[in-house]
Amino acid sequence: MRDILFAAADIWMIAVGLICGVKVIRGQHNYLIGLEWIIMGVSGSNFLVYGVTKAGPDSLTHHIAFFLDAFSRSIGFTLILVLGLLVVTHRYKPTLRVEVGAFSLAAVLGFVLSEFADEIGTPGKVFFLITALATSGFLSYFAWRLREIGERAHAVWLLGATALNVVVASIYDFWRIPGDDADHTRFYILALFTWGLAMLVIYRAYAAFAAHDKRVGAGPDPVTPAPGIEIA
């Protein structure tokens, strides 16, 4: 039963990541969120193969799984996500240089934090937790903004998904779920379901916010854009 639930949770995350990733690129032209969602979908696909084949720690799928996990936990589902949401919350559009730089930084940190995890030790785990909590803070702000524009249902769903994400991030490297097996199957069932839910909820909330901006004819704020950022 655990294996079935694990596969179902993973397939759920894969489907949400790939489908919503493509939709946010095609419909919203937001490559930051879209590509990160697709990367998480690919990560889930690789993790499914890794789990089904029972590949060992020396396998290619193992190294890819740890790299993509570190990629998203360090910069992808944190800084890149926040930059993508700023497009609707603050009407900014990151330049190509910012987009390429963000993904490049995520790739570098993903490699370092996955390949040298044992050498880095606890500081790396704390870094992942801090980035997750900081991102959750911004998502809470995003939920408040949604409430302010009348999208209360989206705000509630976002707060719920964010709360689950905080739980996952808090126990990821620091606490073992009672009764879990050596492969942490129960944890990954919870984590994969949570990440899929978070991506779906954020995608729908983003689309609702973008639609609101379009309805009210929101134009650029009369402020000076940050370095490397141009007004949409």
Indicate residue ranges for each PLM-predicted region.
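Hydrophobic transmembrane alpha-helical segments in integral membrane proteins
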Residues: 1-16, 184
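Membrane-interfacial loop-to-transmembrane alpha-helix junctions, especially the N-terminal start
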Residues: 26-42, 93-102, 151-161, 216-217
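Non-cytosolic membrane-interface motifs at loop->transmembrane helix junctions
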Residues: 59-71, 121-130, 181-191
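A generic, lipid-embedded transmembrane alpha helix
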Residues: 34-57
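Juxtamembrane "helix-exit" motif on the non-cytosolic side of transmembrane helices
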Residues: 51-60, 112-121, 170-181
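Membrane-proximal helix-loop-helix units in multi-pass membrane proteins
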Residues: 75-148
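C-terminal transmembrane-bundle signature of multipass membrane proteins
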Residues: 81, 141-232
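Internal transmembrane alpha-helix with an interfacial aromatic "cap," most often the third helix
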Residues: 15-25, 50-63, 67-103
